[in-house]
Curated annotation (Swiss-Prot):
Residue stretches of biased makeup (Basic residues): 449-458
Protein name per the record: Zinc finger CCCH domain-containing protein 30
Keywords: DNA-binding, Metal-binding, Zinc, Zinc-finger
DNA-binding in keyword set: yes
Source organism of this protein record: Oryza sativa subsp. japonica
């Protein structure tokens, strides 16, 4: 097979006859033929050069012979008409065409108002010119009061009522009210003094004296506030600064004890803890103090207003602070005293040199009695939701559940509407919780139960109708 193949060889002409030939149509552009304009001209020039040489036609293939030269390609430049160049005329603007400064425009009025509104000052010499003429020197000395700045409320209207109910209501007492205090330590029958005996002058009763003076000062301050001293803004709140000054001044404390009158007691056969009653013509006060000492607990039946006040004692820490609860029981119900029954005779108690309390004790006492106690959400809304607390054993001295309920009702300043909450028992739930202004009734049927009832009725009707058919 190798011998049957024919070998192909390329032979070149001699060096003198070797030339480069490019073939393309005259209608085709150099870009379409794959040539640039310079290559096109060079190809044409080389082709004409070889065509003009001797024996050029013999070396060219048939059809590529050179054309006879013609003189028609010569152009006479003198026969071509020429146009003389003329410079264009210069643009000359007339005087009437000049644009004015804008007297008829609207911006000129705004600019004139801006110029007239700017303050002008004339300075006789350059040294009198301030660094910044637009900034007054009085601005540095001026002090702005931030209290005059109005506060923009950020709480929505629907959340405002809930926030008001969470806060403790202001202390608003009518003409007849009772202040009942219950001691944290129950008094047994063995620790009570004899019925007919009198307490000696050397026996000191520090908690009772401090509580009596404090309750008396509180009542005096409340009466002064109700008479109009603070009726403009906080007519029902207690001025703690004034109360602190009264308790710190022995002369003022003695004067208040004289004005309020003696202390008397009322007893009840069904009570378990003794609570002395401080009487004032308009109100009734029932107060007692805890027993901070385990060896003796004394009860007092009267008070001698002629004795001097106890001197202040700074080196002794304050004892336990009694609590005072505000309630409004009916006027026909008697004062409830907790403790064993005592005879009606009330022997007088003569106070000797009773050591006083320190400044820290009075501050703590004012803070304890002057502040408003916040009710728990269950205590605030338990009466309305129908959730009544069962009476249990007394803790920390004990207090009657009825008195607690009365205090809870008296502290509830706003009456809740009986309209049920639309979000309660729903999949999303009420976001206000116990502070919601609407009624949360757990016994009401939910939306799912209502839908189930409707669905069951429809199924029952469909079954009956299918059976008939």
């Amino acid at each position: 097979m190798m011998g049957s193949r024919r070998s192909r060889r390329v032979s070149w002409a001699s060096g003198g006859n070797l030339c480069k030939v490019r073939l393309f149509l005259s209608e085709d552009s150099p870009s379409q033929a794959g040539l640039r304009p310079q290559d096109n001209l060079q190809a044409k020039g080389s082709w004409l050069l070889h065509a003009a040489g001797p024996s050029s036609d013999d070396s060219l293939p048939p059809g590529f012979e050179s054309l006879p030269p013609s003189n028609d390609l010569k152009i006479d430049m003198s026969q071509i008409p020429l146009i003389r160049w003329k410079c264009p005329p210069h643009i000359v603007l007339e005087q009437d065409w000049h644009i004015v400064a804008g007297e008829e425009s609207r911006e000129i009025e705004i600019q004139n108002e801006r110029i007239n509104g700017a303050l002008e000052a004339i300075y006789p010499r350059p040294s009198n010119i301030p660094p910044n003429p637009f900034l007054s020197l009085d601005v540095k000395d001026a002090h702005y009061d931030d209290s005059k700045t109005l506060l923009v409320p950020l709480i929505p209207l629907e959340d405002d009522d809930a926030s008001d109910q969470l806060e403790g209501p202001t202390l608003d007492l009518p003409s007849h009210y009772n202040i009942t205090g219950v001691s944290n330590t129950p008094v047994s029958a063995e620790q009570q003094p004899p019925c007919g005996g009198a307490i000696s002058s050397g026996f000191t009763i520090e908690p009772q004296a401090a509580v009596s003076a404090t309750v008396t000062a509180i009542m005096q301050t409340i009466q002064s506030n109700q008479n109009g001293s603070m009726a403009d803004q906080n007519g029902s709140t207690i001025d703690q600064e004034l109360l602190f000054k009264i308790l710190s001044d022995p002369s003022q404390l003695q004067r208040l004890m004289k004005e309020c009158g003696p202390v008397r007691h009322e007893q009840s056969a069904s009570s378990s803890v003794v609570a002395p009653l401080v009487s004032i013509p308009p109100p009734q006060i029932t107060a007692s103090s805890p027993a901070p000492f385990s060896d003796h607990v004394g009860t007092f039946h009267g008070m001698n207003p002629t004795l001097p006040p106890p001197p202040p004692m700074m080196n002794r820490p304050p004892s336990t602070i009694p609590s005072v609860a505000m309630n409004h029981p009916p006027s026909s119900s008697p004062a409830m005293n907790f403790g064993s029954a005592l005879p009606s005779s009330s022997p007088s108690v003569n106070f000797g040199s009773v050591p006083g309390r320190g400044v820290g004790y009075y501050k703590t006492l004012i803070h304890q009695h002057g502040g408003e106690r916040l009710e728990q959400p269950f205590e605030q809304h338990g009466m309305q939701f129908g959730m009544y607390r069962q009476p249990g054993p007394p803790q920390n001295g004990g207090i009657d559940a009825m008195n607690g309920a009365a205090a809870m009702v008296s502290r509830d300043g706003k009456v809740r509407p009986m309209k049920p909450c639309a979000y309660f028992n729903s999949p999303k739930g009420c976001r206000n919780g116990a502070s919601c202004t609407f009624l949360h009734d757990a016994s009401a049927p939910t939306r799912k139960d209502h839908q189930k009832q409707k669905g069951s009725k429809r199924i029952k009707l469909d079954n009956t109708m299918g059976g008939r058919n």
